[in-house]
């Protein structure tokens, strides 16, 4: 098998370590680097993952590296083609993503500065919350072209929507196609007009009230998991989404995925990072793919853009 380069995951919490394991098991990279500021944690996790290689049959090497906020240890990420930033505080029950903003902004800023220093050609995939704001901050701090900075949100939200539809109708998840745009938060915009089950419009299978109930459940999908866990937040589905994005970049696949990307004129929206569908390849976002939205859906997307724009401007000053 031909492998491609090096990918780094910053943050060895549940989210980051699970992402690293998924990336290693793809067996398409020469090396997966996992970093964290907790001494020994990434090294121990990397050792554990490497010991799974004979069982799972992958040859990708996993390297763990303890780092410090001042930059020690970051030389391990040098030459990374992709960097996934998962570092930051997770939500707790009762918290919104915005409650994390000040602390996580400092973390994302610090990490991004080290990425610029050691992996200046990397594609950045941001997953730290609040997602849209942290993605915009990473883009600003890095100075990278907008196409090389994107955030993981839409894939996760879309997956949650699809699962809830499949669960409600009792059908295989593979038969369901859904889409969510907008922000990774209160102004998330699930798009019922784009939803089908075995090619049939969702509106033909469920009432408007039933669909709206699933839309609301999707918006609260992360909070529902957190409330059940009591400690920590979701990481199985989020890590699957982040790893899938990284794979699309590594393989230059041209896959069309819902991601947080820079919007510059699409949908009549400009100058903001927002959840949209995008074609993903080696250089990051190749192009935004516009859907034919209903008037209410388009209005909701534009409202989401304005709400996110104001928050992104505030974060830039932190």
Label for each model-derived stretch:
Residues 25-31, 143-145:
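Conserved S-adenosyl-L-methionine
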Residues 96-162:
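Rossmann-like NAD(P)(H) cofactor-binding subdomain of soluble oxidoreductases
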Residues 142-148, 157-318:
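C-terminal substrate-binding/catalytic lobe of Rossmann-fold NAD(P)-dependent dehydrogenases
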